[in-house]
Amino acid sequence: MDAEKATDKTNVHLSSDHERCPVEEVALVVPETDDPSLPVMTFRAWFLGLTSCVLLIFLNTFFTYRTQPLTISAILMQIAVLPIGKFMARTLPTTSHNLLGWSFSLNPGPFNIKEHVIITIFANCGVAYGGGDAYSIGAITVMKAYYKQSLSFICGLFIVLTTQILGYGWAGILRRYLVDPVDMWWPSNLAQVSLFRALHEKENKSKGLTRMKFFLVALGASFIYYALPGYLFPILTFFSWVCWAWPNSITAQQVGSGYHGLGVGAFTLDWAGISAYHGSPLVAPWSSILNVGVGFIMFIYIIVPVCYWKFNTFDARKFPIFSNQLFTTSGQKYDTTKILTPQFDLDIGAYNNYGKLYLSPLFALSIGSGFARFTATLTHVALFNGRDIWKQTWSAVNTTKLDIHGKLMQSYKKVPEWWFYILLAGSVAMSLLMSFVWKESVQLPWWGMLFAFALAFIVTLPIGVIQATTNQQPGYDIIGQFIIGYILPGKPIANLIFKIYGRISTVHALSFLADLKLGHYMKIPPRCMYTAQLVGTVVAGVVNLGVAWWMLESIQDICDIEGDHPNSPWTCPKYRVTFDASVIWGLIGPRRLFGPGGMYRNLVWLFLIGAVLPVPVWALSKIFPNKKWIPLINIPVISYGFAGMPPATPTNIASWLVTGTIFNYFVFNYHKRWWQKYNYVLSAALDAGTAFMGVLLFFALQNAGHDLKWWGTEVDHCPLASCPTAPGIKAKGCPVF
């Protein structure tokens, strides 16, 4: 049956008013109908899904090592497979075949929307969460390229697959809390739902463009436009006019630089820059945008300037105001090779001779905000969601109040929880085996693995609640590395491994949960979702590691920005941040930086501050229950206004806030019909057009060395923004005070 006609035929369920989803954004976008007769796991779905998965993981792994990395989202394949699927529906034979008593057809009918969703689930496995590749590849890259460690391919495969499958196990256990409840609505999925409907549903004639025509127009415009910031006029990514007005002022450039400063007055006209770190602002709820904005303004425009110019906190003026580099006390780059033993441990004598490690002021304060964010998340979820979570724990799932989407999903068999327990037990067993067999390579003992699993189990639910309701994911990378850094000081590899099991398994779990909610909205049978996610995860993991291994073995001086090839396109900026984190938390260790006598010891108080701050908000919400805006004050999301900087810049976040405010406040409130019809379609079109042009520019021009060099290709014309201002500190291209 054609998906376009599904609403006219059998087994269509319509809601009554009391069944409608109480979340307005969901009610406006997600269809309240289903056709259970549509085939899902067809030959087309398997072929196109696995092809999309392999192609995306290859491209994303390849691009992530580039000096200008590019993440290609699943939206690219989501669009590309539609004409291919329809072509296969027209040309493949419709004959039924029997295999071991199982009847199937290569062509069961027209290409339908549920097949398309399953293909996208496969494709999402080829993108992984956020970075375009498995996070464990970051640890493997740091081990091989930065620490020059000899690591076996089998050990690397264990690391990649166990972290991914462990996350899937957490996701299965937490479905009843983060997928089934109505209030867990996962805002980012609405863009996907809107795009699927635009591609498959026939709209009644109405004023204005259909969603499909609007999507194609926006896609074409985005595709053409990205040639400007992506190649011809890159300065559009960081438009820092303050630096042009005061070309000789260090202070003005520190304040106004969009790339190396606070970004006051700077802006970006590059969609990739707007959506790079917090995702598309068009899919974030207005309350979330407002909370992030409050945190951003407090941090960038009040806290950082006061600490830098007023109090010189942490010897701030010795270093650039904004940098992810590590420094010596004299403001020079910190050379970690001088303090490493051949076993990749800290040489304490060499460290004492070489000197302490220092951070840029914004980097240090951003780490402190991570301390507050972790405890604030636990307190916030305990206070605002604890009672509901407790009730769901001790009551049968079937007694949970269901909206129309939950009722429609009752037509399908659920996935038994023991299927997920098997995956969880298998990944835990393989991880523990790895800690014994490759003990020297991973440095993390078996009890460290168990501790990482326990930490992931504790935090996945509260962080999932925040992401499912606000579209923001409070990270706790810093906390995991902080804890194990105290327990196992001087062991950077152990710190990396602990991070990917204790933190990144949570990231993967939340990615899988988001896809499960997408399947819930699109009425995909849960067992089909299970199969697609599991197979896609394993295939993507193997290809991901294979491509990364090939590149690490075949490209000379990959990730070496200070070697014989300073202009190499393979400088791995993303993995440089991972390496820096392993030095801060693993090699040097939190005791030396944040313990008694450490330069950054006072930041530890932010653990307590973060734990306390949600309490008055919760108390006010109980005292004034009619003030519906009080519970919308979300301390973890406010602290997320500082998250990701660096490598995110203030200009990235400020532009995200402005764009989100325009669409999810003004357009949503004053042009709701336009917002309902086009908002999420526009988000998908901007992502897709940018991705298509990014791939084209790379293969047609940049990979062939056809780079432009003129005024418009400079980053932001703020050469003095990275200069220190303390007396006697020397830096290249900077005056000495």
Swiss-Prot record:
Protein name, as recorded: Oligopeptide transporter 3
The keyword Flavoprotein is annotated on this UniProt entry: no
Keyword Protein transport: yes
Sorted UniProt keywords: Developmental protein, Membrane, Peptide transport, Protein transport, Transmembrane, Transmembrane helix, Transport
Pfam families: OPT
InterPro entries linked: Oligpept_transpt, OPT
Tissue expression as described in the entry: Strong expression in flowers, leaves and roots. Preferentially expressed in the vascular tissues of seedlings and mature plants as well as in pollen and developing embryos.
Cellular component aspect of the GO annotation: cytosol; membrane; plasma membrane; plasmodesma
Organism annotation: Arabidopsis thaliana
Cited function: May be involved in the translocation of tetra- and pentapeptides across the cellular membrane in an energy-dependent manner. Also acts as a metal transporter that could be a component of the copper transport machinery. Essential for early embryo development.
Example GO molecular function: oligopeptide transmembrane transporter activity
Superkingdom of this protein's organism: Eukaryota
Subcellular location: Membrane
Entry's family note: Belongs to the oligopeptide OPT transporter (TC 2.A.67.1) family.
Topological relation to the membrane, as annotated: Multi-pass membrane protein
